[in-house]
Amino acid sequence: MKTYNRLISLHQKGDLKNALKLAELLIEKNPEIAKIHNFLGLINSSLYKNEESLKNFSKATEIKKNYAEAHNNKGVLLNQMGRFKEASEEFNKAITIRPYYAAAYKGQGDNLIDLGKYEEGIQNYSKALDLKPDFTDAKIKLIESLTFFNSKKQKSNSFVSTNNLLQNLKLDYDLNKKIRDEEVIDFFQKSNEILFKNIKNHEEIEFDNRQLFRRGNLDLNCERHKTIFENFNTIAKYCFGCFKVQIDPKNIIDLIKLFLVFDRLKLPNSKNIKKCLIEMRPDISGSYKGLVYCFSLKEAEEVKIILTEILTKVISKTIKIKIRRGCTEFGEAYPKYEEVDKKEEDLMKYNEKWLVNEKLMDERLPKRKTSKERVILGTNSGISLNDILVIHNWLIYAKKIGDLSYKKIVKNDQEILSSPNMDMDMSLQLSERVSYFSSN
């Protein structure tokens, strides 16, 4: 038992190399103990050894016929690999063995969402929360899914019913005249009233998302590109065609105004993703940002013209708008990459020698995001529960960095939901973030 606990500890610490050695040693000594095969599957999955991991989970269920946890773990891995039908079968096996297994319902929910079956996915998330009310991951997944789909069958779930009420909220603003501060205040107060009235124990939601998106049915697969950069310090080929129009709101009120604009803004290319965020990356300057993702420098220049005309009219004549290329981290590693003040043909080009790194990583990474079976929906317009919870995190941020405009939005600080993770993350860089805001 001590050796097995040490194995768990090594895995939790991220010491996968030694965890793998210990797991293989334990299996050599105890080949018929199912839980060791199951744990070896988790380790191999963390090491991107997906086929080995599948064999481990299968061996665990072969040894122990009614091993719900191993079936669930196999389902999670198959989902990540884009093998959705097989994943569904494994989750069903786990649920048949253990009907009150919340994690399996959550996993099945994830799988159904990937297949575009949102109503069924939400039903599974709701079941997971019925079984385990403090299941944070299931709460987050359910709330996120409501950004894309309005459930009609799960009205007994307080998250669903609250989201439906928020979606019916009529906001009186348009993009032809200035959005007044009072309209932002009214929007938040009405949304907050719905939130506090309809969700019991709302202080226990623990929702840590900090970005708001409006997008069509496109996934930029940024996680893949960042993984390539983190592992090889090279930029993915896709990112050489990625340009962003960046907007820098001066305070929390202007950030919310920008979000309201993005919610209604229709650009010529429906695939342009729009995002509002608070800056939380260490050593990255700025406080509040809006981004519109474009697919060429020419398109970014055209979008900048559109945004300048609208935002100087509805938010501020002095709002800052500029064009950036790719992720900030890429430009720090390769300064020429972020240069955009020249003709597109003169910009930094992709180094074809880097392609070997991409192919190597693509062989290791799960295929879920590139599966042809995966269905991607665009976000709903109007206000969602996800939106208002993210804005609560924005207000925490504003308060901590000294942006006193947040006091216009809330009558008192008790109207802002607490977030222990936000508090922790901010404590690690508070002086830095205060400095960035005060120098803006």
Task: Give the location of each predicted region.
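Charge-rich, low-complexity segments
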Residues: G107, D114, D134-F259, S270, ...
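Helix N-cap motif at beta-to-alpha junctions
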Residues: N251-I252, C294-E301
